[in-house]
């Protein structure tokens, strides 16, 4: 996937770097795999705002993604590569030989007409899904489960991947996209390859209106608020706000927020890079 620079015919196009959708298939989404999404505007069931700076945007429909890949030893053919408004990665529509259809996260390099497979004793080729214990050491993977059968939880966004470093008895060691080294059960499923749309981090929207199309409202700085609204608010003139804090008063630069008694701390061999 590549990006393209737009000619500066208008102020909104001057700095815009847009995604190049030439790798996508010009087709409509599969109706049987769509769900309607009701816009909440960041409000909960009582109408109170729980998420700020959210609302508006274009109407979307959710694609039902197969994060489990448990159709073992049933070949599937890639029918199309499509855009998904709910995520940064592209998705691939699979047609199984038994007549079933499903969407998966499209790995980099997967093309229309390619065959993919899930199972225990299959080749570690791009798009194939298998338990981590059956993969060779050094394999690049994405769409990784944390608990067997629950579906993928890690390395799902555009351009991300993890590397299988070692295998010991029931567990394997992975280097995650954050740089964290973590042990995961060997029975957990993962897909071979890197997630598609790796140039996503180079995209520049170019104007505020494009953020509004995505459902993002303007974010107010803490120092621009009143003291009643934010710890960094108030002051005479343009005050710095003092030491950076979150709206709830926590230090915003470097304070560890992870629960030190969390059960999974024993599976983390080294923390993510700063």
Swiss-Prot record:
GO cellular component: large ribosomal subunit
SUPFAM superfamilies the record matches: Nucleic acid-binding proteins, Translation proteins SH3-like domain
UniProt keyword rRNA-binding present: yes
Gene Ontology terms, MF aspect: rRNA binding; structural constituent of ribosome; transferase activity
A Pfam family assignment: Ribosomal_L2_C
The keyword Transferase belongs to this UniProt entry's keyword annotation: no
InterPro entries: NA-bd_OB-fold, Rib_uL2_dom2, Ribosomal_uL2, Ribosomal_uL2_bac/org-type, Ribosomal_uL2_C, Ribosomal_uL2_CS, Ribosomal_uL2_dom3, Ribosomal_uL2_RNA-bd_dom
One BP term from GO: cytoplasmic translation
UniProt KW keywords: Ribonucleoprotein, Ribosomal protein, RNA-binding, rRNA-binding
Residue ranges of the region described as Disordered: 223-274
Transmembrane intervals: none
Assembly description: Part of the 50S ribosomal subunit. Forms a bridge to the 30S subunit in the 70S ribosome.
Similarity comment: Belongs to the universal ribosomal protein uL2 family.
PANTHER family in the record: LARGE RIBOSOMAL SUBUNIT PROTEIN UL2M, RIBOSOMAL PROTEIN L2
Functional note: One of the primary rRNA binding proteins. Required for association of the 30S and 50S subunits to form the 70S ribosome, for tRNA binding and peptide bond formation. It has been suggested to have peptidyltransferase activity; this is somewhat controversial. Makes several contacts with the 16S rRNA in the 70S ribosome.
Name this protein carries in UniProt: Large ribosomal subunit protein uL2
Species of provenance: Amoebophilus asiaticus (strain 5a2)
UniProt gene name: rplB
